[in-house]
Structure formats: C-alpha cells, structure tokens
Amino acid sequence: MIKLSDSEDEECNERTSLITSESPPLPSYQDGVQASEGLETSYHRERQPDSTQNNEDVPNGRTSGADAYNSETTVENEEEELTLKYGARHVIMLFVPVTLCMVVVVATIKSVSFYTEKDGQLIYTPFSEDTTSVGERLLNSVLNTLIMISVILVMTIFLVLLYKYRCYKFIHGWLILSSLMLLFMFTYIYLSEVFKTYNIAMDYPTLFMVIWNFGAVGMICIHWKGPLQLQQAYLIMISALMALVFIKYLPEWSAWVILGAISVYDLLAVLCPKGPLRMLVETAQERNEPIFPALIYSSAMMWTVGMADSATADGRMNQQVQHIDRNTPEGANSTVEDAAETRIQTQSNLSSEDPDEERGVKLGLGDFIFYSVLVGKAAATASGDWNTTLACFVAILIGLCLTLLLLAVFKKALPALPISITFGLIFYFSTDNIVRPFMDTLASHQMYI
C-alpha cells in the first residue's frame, strides 16, 4: 500500500481549502475557444479573396503555367546559390586544416634532421632500395607497394566487416590503442627530437607530465567530448605525426609508387559498387550513424558538445519546475510558462544550429596523411628546393578544390586522393626535373626574370 507523506496531505488540504464550493469559471479555456473561433473567422475571411482569385485564374491556364515555371526557376536559383555558398565555405573549412597539417610536416622536415635520416624501414616494406641497379630498385619499390596496398586493403575490409556486424566495442578498442600510440609514444619521440634540435633542456618528469596531459586531453576530445576546435587540432596533429613516420621509414622510390597506387586504390574503394570504403559509408548512412571521429576530420560537430549543453539546460529547467512553490498557484503558473518558453527557445536554437552542423564537410585522416607525405617527401628529397615544395602544396590545394567542386555537383561521397595526388606527382617531377635545373642555371649566370 502506497501512502502519501504528511507534507503532501497538508498541501492538499491547503489547496482544497482555497477552492470555493461554486464551480469556478474557466476564462482561459473560453478565451482560447473564442480566440480559435476568431482565428478561424479571420482565416476564412482572408482566404475568400484568394479563392475567388484562384477561381478567376483557373480558366487562364497560361498564367498558372507561368507562375509554376517562375516558382521552379526561383527554387533552382536558390539551390544554385546555396550550393555555391556552402561550396566556397567548405573549401575554406578544408584549406585551413590541410594547410596546417602540411606546414607542420614541412617545418619539421626542414628543421629536425631525425625524420630525413634513413636508419630503418617499415615492416610492410621489407625490400631494400640500397642498390645501384635501376631495374632492381624499381622492382623492389613495386613489391613494397603491393605489400603496402594489400595490408591497407585487408585492414579496411576487416574494419568494414566489424562495422557491418556491429562490433563497435572492438573497433573502439582498436582505435583507442592506435590513438594511445600516436598521442603518447610518437609524441614523445617527436618532442625529444625537437628538443635535441633546438637544444632545449628538460627533465624527464616534466616531459612525462607534458606528454601525459597532452595525450589524456587528446583521448578525451577524440573519443568522448570536447570543444570542436580542440578535437580538430588533435586530429591534425596525429595526422602530421603519422605522416612524419611514413616519410622517415618509407624508401624514396617506394614512397612515390605508393602515393600513385594509393590514389588508384582510393578511387576504386570509394566508387566501385562493392568497394570497402563505399560499403562503410553506405552502412553508416543506412543506420543514420556518424563514422568514428578517430577516422574522420569533420568541420562540424559529430558527437556535438551541444548535446551536453542542451542536457544541462534541460536539467536546469527541470530543477526550476521541481522547485515551484506549490502554495502560490500564480507563481507556479508563471514559472511553468517561463520554463516552457525557455525549452522552446532552446529547441529552436538547436534546430537552427543543426542545418549548419549537418552541412559540415568531412575528410578522412588518411587523406591528410598522404597529402602531408607528398609535400614532406618533396621537401626532404628535392635537394631542399622550395619551388618544388610550394608546387606540390599548390597542386594539392587545386586538386582539393576540384574534388569539392565535383562533390557539390554529384552530391555523394567521392575519393579525395586521386586528383590531388595526381596533380602533386605531376608538379613534383616536372618542377624537380625542369624548373629547378632552369632556375639553377639562371642563378649561376646571375640572370633574373
């Protein structure tokens, strides 16, 4: 048997003692009925001229057809303007992070000699290129490329299968281990070499404390919640660290062949009907789920921090409703109305922010990595020539612009590597073999154009 507390009985007695024996009037209900009747009357009055006008326009088929054509033209123009607006906005949203990632890589390559020294190779590229024979070196680079692409293909298919069968915990654990390695071990190596290069003295406890704070905040921002800009900064940083590892441990010829092969693989994996990346994107769209933030750079919130803010706001409003003074009905009504208005405003603000968040453009971290590998290799192997590095940088941005243009036209997921990498390879070899010797000849003869 459930029994109310004594305080609740007292409140009920006080509440009932305030009510008279007569049936109270219901002004709010009657006013609402009158208001609705007035609205219906005014609505009918306003609609009468329109109905007569429509009756007059029905015989005139040309006028109605012209109006329909004008409305369709207006809608098409608005869609084109919206596409151009958000297309330009998306270009700017991607130019900044891609540029920052490449700048970090190039600055590190130019200043820290550790990442240009060849003292080992990746396990995925077992064939060495330390030979004078061009044919043997080319063969080894092709074999290394085949092994590397095969590993990427197998791991991608494995990831797609895990996602298809909803093995989310395994995927999260896999990504968390990768992020831990990047944010702690690779960051330690990077900071150690930077401090050695610039002769900065730091004791190990302080260094470990810095790395611990950096890695812990990064894990929280990437895999849980955090400010959008901080999450983006961490994604850019781990992409740069991974690119530096590839630049150091990939053989020179193998790196260029891998860049060409990975662009072809990206094209097939995204556009083929049974491509692994296409299946991953389609599965995520069917389930209406975001792809894991550790794999995708997003210019909009994926696990939005607004969710926490809205939950906090809802909690505050619930607390306001729970702390209503039941002894004052007028104050209770006003507080409930204020809470309802606040909730409506919060929902309207969230709904107004949702379209911008949905329009955010997303780019895979692999694209960041291979863009930076291309520019970093150009900076490391082009005899320190800035013309070649800048040419590759411009080529990647041009390819990214064209990719975003195609994205606005086709409105579906497209590979971001083929155009940019193709332009980058063309600009690299043409600048390194044609422009650089020409500039050196002009400089040796003290001729300036």
Swiss-Prot record:
Residues 112-141, 191-203, 248-252, 384-389 are lumenal. GO terms for biological process: amyloid-beta formation; calcium ion homeostasis; membrane protein ectodomain proteolysis; Notch signaling pathway; protein processing. Highest expression in ovaries and to a lesser extent in kidney, brain, eye and lung. Weak expression in testis, intestine, liver and heart. Present in trace amounts in skeletal muscle. It is found in: Endoplasmic reticulum membrane; Golgi apparatus membrane. GO terms for molecular function: aspartic endopeptidase activity, intramembrane cleaving. Residues 1-75 are annotated as: Disordered. The keyword Transmembrane applies. Glycans are attached at N387. Probable catalytic subunit of the gamma-secretase complex, an endoprotease complex that catalyzes the intramembrane cleavage of integral membrane proteins such as Notch receptors. May play a role in negative regulation of apoptotic cascades during oogenesis and embryogenesis, and in developmentally matured tissues such as brain tissue. This is Presenilin-2. It comes from Xenopus laevis (African clawed frog).
